[in-house]
Amino acid sequence: MEQNIVFGIDVSSHSSTVCVVIDRIKQGKPFTISNDSFGYQKLLDHLNRYLITPLVVFESTGVYSLSLQAFLEENHIKYLKLNPLKAKKLMDNN
């Protein structure tokens, strides 16, 4: 059975916090990356540790998430960009 690996990213203005979840179980402690080429390389290094490509999930935070989205697209990494209002509504209903 194939694992479901998700990298959840909380994007802020200067840095982002990354949490890894495998089959709905949080793996270790979240880590922080800078929102620049050095931070994105660190993210790529973590993504490449897995045999299957993880799905990256993040909220659309306007200008703050644009560089992350561009990086993911350039590197052909699957991602899901959430509408923040819909994400909050989903969380409030659970």
What are the language-model segments listed below?
Residues 1-94:
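Phosphate- and other anionic-substrate recognition elements at nucleic-acid/protein interfaces
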